Design a protein with these regions (language model features):
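Active-site mouth of glycoside hydrolases
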Residues: 1-93
Length: 93
């Protein structure tokens, strides 16, 4: 079983635009590309954890589930959205 944490659903991208990656030139990635969410976003992390918890509650005892992938093809992307910049500034202190 997999979660959609690598590519959040379109409703999440539209309702919470602050979860989207932002490039150095200020371009915000939109839904339609893979891995467009910012792991630095507290909103994204909260919603991802909630989704994982709900799936675990629903499928946790299902004997047909033999494995669970929480993310798919994690990658490193440069991220300049507000949450990433704030976290980096805090790290530098």
């Amino acid at each position: 079983m997999c979660t959609s944490t690598a590519t959040p659903p379109v409703w999440l991208s539209r309702k919470y635009p602050e979860v989207l990656l932002k490039s150095e030139d200020g371009t915000v990635q939109d839904h339609g590309a893979r891995q467009h969410a910012s792991f630095a976003s507290p909103v994204y992390r909260k919603l991802a954890y909630r989704m994982i918890e709900e799936l675990a509650r629903h499928y946790g005892k299902d004997s047909r589930i033999i494995g669970w992938q929480l993310d798919n093809e994690p990658t490193v992307q440069f991220d300049y959205n507000q949450a990433a910049e704030e976290a980096f500034r805090e790290f530098l202190k």
